[in-house]
Amino acid sequence: MGIHNNPLEQHVRLNAESCMFSRSFQIRHKHGQVDDKPYGGGPGMVMQAKPVLESIEQARDGNSEIPVFFLSPQGKRFNQEKAKELSELDQIIIVSSRYEGLDQRAIDQTDNHEEISIGDFVLSGGETACAVVIDAVARLIPGVLGDNESVIEESFSNGLLEYPHYTRPSEVNGQDVPGILLSGDHEKIKEWRKIQSLRNTFIKRPDLIDKSKLNDDEIKVIDDIKNDPE
């Protein structure tokens, strides 16, 4: 809702075998008004509840079991784990608001709903946030991306940041590609990438280390990194 089709088409180009279908719904009623001044005063306009509720009803098409996700800075943080959860659902409805926000009654009167947030910052409208959620979810659906292995190895797929990437040429301004990547030894490369993933996460996002379920070998690597962060 409230998002044009073009951004959806540009974020993930679906191949012919993909089973994803997205559709936007018009929330404006026949007079074209969907917002009004807030009760109690204050700046800006508030999206009215009734047009939103009617659009949700239209999108559900009689199936009240379809979950509705309201994009809101008050919602639970959207992350890779949540994206994976949404990608496994047959259908979802995403509601993005504009102006100062959405009449609370639209949320209160919607069964089977959840509020989600893409971060602690403010956007001019929810369309961008909606596109972010759709892109993160769609690429996890089998067949959407050409290489499913790339999804498995990406940052956050296992709760950690990804390892650094390199490509040709092997030297740029005096900086060489790590020699291990040129060795052809796939087991050693895999081990190096695992260590670099742990190092990246520990240095850049230590909060993720606390949330990750590390095995004994990974914990030892973290201990080594603590003793020698370079």
What is each of the regions a protein language model found here?
Residues 18-21, 68-70, 115-117:
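Conserved beta-strand scaffold positions in the cores of enzyme catalytic domains, especially
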Residues 48-98, 102-104:
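S-adenosyl-L-methionine/SAH cofactor-binding core of RNA-modifying enzymes
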Residues 170-230:
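SAM-dependent methyltransferases
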Residues 106-154:
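Structured adenosyl-cofactor binding patch, chiefly the S-adenosyl-L-methionine
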Residues 21-40:
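Short, surface-exposed acidic-centric catalytic microdomains
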Residues 128, 140-180:
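Internal, active-site/partner-interface "lid" segment
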